[in-house]
Every structure is written in C-alpha cells, then in structure tokens.
Design a protein with these regions (language model features):
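N-terminal acidic leader/helix
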Residues: 1-20
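Amphipathic, hydrophobic secondary-structure cores in small proteins
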Residues: 14-56
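Acidic, Ser/Thr-rich low-complexity linear motifs
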Residues: 59-60
Length: 60
C-alpha cells in the first residue's frame, strides 16, 4: 500500500472509530499476522503508525 492510501485509511479509521482507531488497526494487524498475511499485517502496522502520528503526543 502506498503512503497516500495508508494516510487515507488512517484518516477514515480515525474519523469512524475515534480513540479506538489505533486499537482497531492493531487488532487487524494481529489478525493478518495470524492468517499468514505478512504484507497485509505490514499495511496495518503503517496505518496504526499514521493514526498515532495524527493523534499527536499523549498527555498524561
């Protein structure tokens, strides 16, 4: 998946799932890994990273 698609998926997931978007991407990454789909798992890892970057630093 190219960078533009990754960003589009991340934005859409963040818009639809809000604060749960990163967890959703992580879940899908794990599912792809378990299903023996390393390329798909890598796509979800990148989407998760993009979501994290969009959300910015966590404040505690």
């Amino acid at each position: 998946m190219d960078a533009t698609k990754t960003t589009e998926y991340a934005r859409a997931l963040l818009s639809s799932r809000g604060g749960k978007a990163e967890a959703e991407a992580a879940r899908r990454m794990q599912e792809a890994t378990k299903a023996g789909k390393p390329d798909e798992a890598e796509d979800w890892r990148r989407i998760r990273l993009a979501i994290s970057e969009m959300r910015g630093p966590r404040q505690g």
